[in-house]
């Protein structure tokens, strides 16, 4: 680990990076080492690429110990800057944090890779003009880019680094200026459109004023020439067809005078008189029509008001009629409901009476059959007991039968009387309900 002031460079695997808890000035970068991403923390504005190389080698030695495979001194290694297929060797004194910030939006496309200086390409892809003019005694194909940069003097190395920074700054300025130009063009376009819209609105207002002036001038000219009522006079003036008719009439009158001068027939004069009378009637009818049309235009407002009053009165009368009809309908509906209830009640009473009638008929039939049997028994027993009957005495058995028969008849009459009373009461109830 290499100390720089109060900060220390620390390296670790990127996927095992803990939560960041460092000062505002500390930064970090990612460096690829043997196909692994190493996170270098604690960078400051004075940290160079050589410091980063030394920190990476020390961390590798601490983790692997004797099994390490990055052998050699820090001067034997270099950091390569890769961007979109292009590569460049960073000099040892390159300020790594400044370079990283200079990339700006292109940082995701840029990578730092740690390689051995001897394993890199013999000729660098990015070379400055000063580097091309250098006449080195050593053979170029025997030197790697890192060794080649090391052979250059420190002044030229600084120039190369400055030139790369200038190029990066220029690229950044070009992108910013392009975006700024696009925004400026949009702003200018909006301002120009707003200006044209204001001009068009102003022109429309001027045209409206000119039209109003022309109409006022035309109105004054007509008033001076034809008077204030020139509109009404224009509608009441005879049309071109009427003028032609008048000319035709004059022409016909001239012809009639000539005919009269030629022939003094009385019949022709009578025909002409009839014709003139017909014409006079037509003209009078047309005049009356025109007068009526003018009067109609004048009286339209009064008629409209009268019609509105009549409509309002008609509406009120219709509303009153509707209310009356609604009340009458409600009364009729209530009366109908009462009648329906009475009908249902009378139907139920009739059904009950029909059932009672059936029961009484069955009882009557049964009693009639029992009476017939009793009469036959009486006859048979009378024949057997002719002797005691001749004495005028009634046997006790016959007295019992007779008493039973009388009781039965009395009971029958009692039942019928009860039913008759029920029927009378029910009839009285029905009559009261109907009233």
Curated annotation (Swiss-Prot):
Ranges annotated as spanning the membrane: none
A single BP term in Gene Ontology: intracellular transport
Coiled-coil region list: 195-290
Domain called Ras-associating: residue spans: 25-119
SUPFAM superfamilies membership: Ubiquitin-like
Compartments reported by the entry: Endosome
Principal cellular location given in the protein's record: other
Gene3D superfamilies in alphabetical order: Phosphatidylinositol 3-kinase Catalytic Subunit, Chain A, domain 1
Name of the molecule in the record: Ras association domain-containing protein 9
Organism in which the protein naturally occurs: Homo sapiens (Human)
